[in-house]
Amino acid sequence: SGRVQKDPLTIEIDSVDALPAIEQQFFETSQQGKIPLLQKLLSQHQPASCVVFCNTKKDCQSVCDALNAAGQSALSLHGDLEQRDRDQTLVRFANGSARVLVATDVAARGLDIKSLELVVNFELAWDPEVHVHRIGRTARAGNSGLAISFCAPEEAQRANILSEMLQIKLNWMNPPAGVSLVPLEAEMATLCIDGGKKAKMRPGDVLRSEEHTSEL
């Protein structure tokens, strides 16, 4: 092909065999059906930690808002956040103050989360290599993991390209039936105290703040 193409493009994708402990599941759904399906799957699997990937900042925030409205503890991570807010989000997710992190690919660069049980592609990535990087965040350090991908009709071509590039047959699943929505509550709560020596704060002040919070 190099003799007939002026500048042939070679696409290299990490072998899916390099991710043997990851189970991949694909669900066909409409755009409107993605949020209800996500809520059902979170209720079904009850992950201790989950990252949901979106392709845009707008979708990232709207998905996060919808999950929180349904009692699923979620945080958003996207480019519109200030660095301080981004850092606080990562700390809260790492210590269990939220069980779901809804993120864009750009904001999630360099994100390293231990024992991540579930990755959800709310939208299929445009680039198959990005898909591999997304799902590769689970099943680390010898652990197993689950990667779930949603596919709306307009994303069918991306699914076909993904199957071809990874040389795998996609595992299409039926939506779960008879699943009751169960709140995905956070295991911990994080207190953000904006003060210190200059504010003349003492350890006892922090303790009293925690006691007051527990009484609310």
PLM regions: where:
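Post-DEXD/H (motif II) to motif III coupling segment of the RecA-like Helicase ATP-binding lobe
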Residues: 1-18, 160-169
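Conserved small/polar residues in nucleotide/adenosyl-binding loops
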Residues: 211-216
